[in-house]
């Protein structure tokens, strides 16, 4: 079973969200209440679902998006990936974790920009230490 991080779902709430370094604040489309989702929250939800593969929390940008915005998004997504790795390692060390062998996959972002697509691929492969 593969679970998604919620990044695309947050993207789909563009008019209701506010992206920050710590994560994303958004208003429920159902009742308007404020909700926060960050890398750690995403990992905890996916761990509780006991999927085989969990996806790292990422920022999905519109197509097309300006280069600078996309670059900042790629850098934030890489930082979020590192936080996902840290949280997954912590969760997998707990006695009550259901699936201690859950795998974490990074998501390749970068919009339409080849250099950014290559950069995040390199970050995912070499800098994140995926479990």
Predicted regions and their residues:
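Non-catalytic, usually N-terminal nucleic-acid engagement modules in DNA/RNA processing proteins
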Residues: 1-98
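Glycine-rich phosphate/ribose-binding loops and adjacent secondary-structure elements
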Residues: 75-78, 84-95, 99-131
């Amino acid at each position: 079973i593969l679970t998604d991080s919620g990044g695309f779902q947050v993207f789909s709430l563009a008019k209701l969200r506010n992206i920050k370094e710590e994560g994303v604040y958004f208003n429920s489309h159902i009742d308007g209440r404020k909700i926060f989702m960050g890398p750690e929250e995403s990992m905890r939800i996916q761990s509780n679902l006991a999927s085989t593969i969990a996806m790292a929390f990422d920022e999905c940008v519109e197509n097309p998006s300006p280069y600078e915005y996309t670059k900042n998004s790629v850098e934030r997504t890489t930082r979020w990936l590192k936080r996902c790795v840290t949280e997954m390692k912590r969760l997998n060390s707990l006695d009550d974790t259901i699936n201690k062998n859950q795998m974490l996959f990074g998501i390749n972002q970068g919009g339409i920009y080849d250099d950014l697509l290559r950069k995040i691929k390199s970050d995912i492969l070499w800098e994140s230490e995926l479990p």
